[in-house]
Amino acid sequence: MATYLIGDVHGCYDELIALLHKVEFTPGKDTLWLTGDLVARGPGSLDVLRYVKSLGDSVRLVLGNHDLHLLAVFAGISRNKPKDRLTPLLEAPDADELLNWLRRQPLLQIDEEKKLVMAHAGITPQWDLQTAKECARDVEAVLSSDSYPFFLDAMYGDMPNNWSPELRGLGRLRFITNAFTRMRFCFPNGQLDMYSKESPEEAPAPLKPWFAIPGPVAEEYNIAFGHWASLEGKGTPEGIYALDTGCCWGGTLTCLRWEDKQYFVQPSNRHKDMGEGEAVAS
């Protein structure tokens, strides 16, 4: 029994299947963890969702910003951008089934035995694990309810960008969503910066990558995340695993076998013909 962690798939179905074949992933025996952003930009978002859904209890995933944007398009809130290549998914006969399944997926995965936490963008250093759990549940409850379009319409935006237990309503939900799915850089006090996308070496002072700011979760747990392809899986402290290596941009799809920390990569089938972008407003 092995646990495989794979970075952002972004609709790269062929690469995902090739990578799982390479590691001899066996559903029912092994477990697959996915860092979110299953869809958009690659050509196979429909096949990715169908396959991941079919894995049942053999998969543990978290939602990413592109997944949330897809749900907003599905709900009629945001427009379908051609570059996201989502039309085959949105027009599929099983679209309702797939997307209603998708909106019931979590923002946070935790394995206490492995001391492993996974979120799409990471864990803000302003949270301890209990707070992260409670915050994830808040958004998950709204997404799985009948009022989810109201939340999706309000999730776009950069404020508030500083955590407070006193946050309420849509502002609280927006901060939680941004922290779990869009975060890259923080100010030294942990306040989110939602504008900078440079490499850590090029970021303006005093910004630091979220994982470079001490936080209570990273003190006790390993953290796996995706979202930040320009890191190329490098430059993180011990116990912090950056798994998005830009498959949809012409990079690779990366898999970490947890038990022995061995990495496997599958080269992209695409040329790097576009720069990194985001579907959710950043």
UniProtKB/Swiss-Prot annotation:
Family annotation (Gene3D superfamilies): 3.60.21.10
GO function term, MF aspect, one: bis(5'-nucleosyl)-tetraphosphatase (symmetrical) activity
EC number(s) stated in the UniProt entry for this protein: 3.6.1.41
Hydrolase as UniProt keyword: yes
Entry keyword Hydrolase: yes
Keywords: Hydrolase
Any Pfam family the entry gives: Metallophos
Catalysed reactions, as listed in the record: P(1),P(4)-bis(5'-adenosyl) tetraphosphate + H2O = 2 ADP + 2 H(+)
Source organism, top-level taxon: Bacteria
InterPro entries for the chain: ApaH, Calcineurin-like_PHP_ApaH, Metallo-depent_PP-like
Family: Belongs to the Ap4A hydrolase family.
Subunit structure: Monomer.
Function (record text): Hydrolyzes diadenosine 5',5'''-P1,P4-tetraphosphate to yield ADP.
Database matches in PANTHER family: CYTOCHROME C5, PTHR40942
Protein name (Swiss-Prot/TrEMBL): Bis(5'-nucleosyl)-tetraphosphatase, symmetrical
Organism expressing this protein natively: Escherichia coli O6:H1 (strain CFT073 / ATCC 700928 / UPEC)
